[in-house]
UniProtKB/Swiss-Prot annotation:
The keyword Zinc does not apply. It comes from the Eukaryota. Residues 236-259 form a coiled coil. This is Protein CDI. Keywords: Coiled coil, Cytoplasm, Fertilization, Germination, Transferase. One of its GO terms (biological process) is pollen germination. Mostly expressed in pollen grains and pollen tubes, and, at low levels, in seedlings, roots, stems, leaves, flowers and siliques. It is found in: Cytoplasm, Cytosol. GO terms for cellular component: cytosol. Its main location: cytoplasm. The gene is CDI. Disruption phenotype: Impaired pollen germination and pollen tube growth thus leading to disrupted male transmission.
Amino acid sequence: MTISNGDVKSETCNNGSSEKKPFRIFVGYDPREDLAYQVCHHSITKRSSIPVEITPIIQSDLRKKGLYWRERGQLESTEFSFSRFLTPHLSDYQGWAMFVDCDFLYLADIKELTDLIDDKYAIMCVQHDYTPKETTKMDGAVQTVYPRKNWSSMVLYNCGHPKNKTLSPEIVNTQTGAFLHRFQWLEDEEIGSIPFVWNFLEGHNRVVEKDPTTQPKAVHYTRGGPWFDAWKDCEFADLWLNEMEEYNKENKKEADNAK
């Protein structure tokens, strides 16, 4: 990510390939979770065998561009609670793109996820049956409970699907949380299912011994990750911390080389 004078530039990683059009990934960005964003970004590009274009969804930038104007509600735990639904619009309603929260750590090649794409669906996501036990999360934010919770935290959008044109800036800024987070602009059969290992909820999902289909491909620190003091000892904290150390070393090396 490059931020200059408030403008955000997406970054493309093609791992040596320049032929295939990059797969677009929009990552929710919150200023208090900058490190989480950087580590998520690093975990994707490090393992991707296909070109990817990663863009942070930064609320202040969207406001400057006139794409986002709704007031923040008391129950919004992040700055991207609703701006995430601008993904099809930001993709010019063309092709497939992914939105993902910044509190993800990718452990597998994103190509494996794109191989699951089926054009008959308007969106695809992990369809969790999740009721959190905690009353707070992250740095003390209220933990809300609602149907289809966490479905919207990682979504593959078929941006060219006619139904997704419903997600105009006007709708994203005025519709209810229920309408957006429960995908009420779609019929149930228009929502494709993805294996839970691509949105493996820390503290909820479980790895079954000797069952490789339960090994996480993307860990979601939905309750709060090691970048928050209250969650330094959460499950899979070591994986995230190792990724952070690697990111920091590479970042320092790049900075030293630029001197």
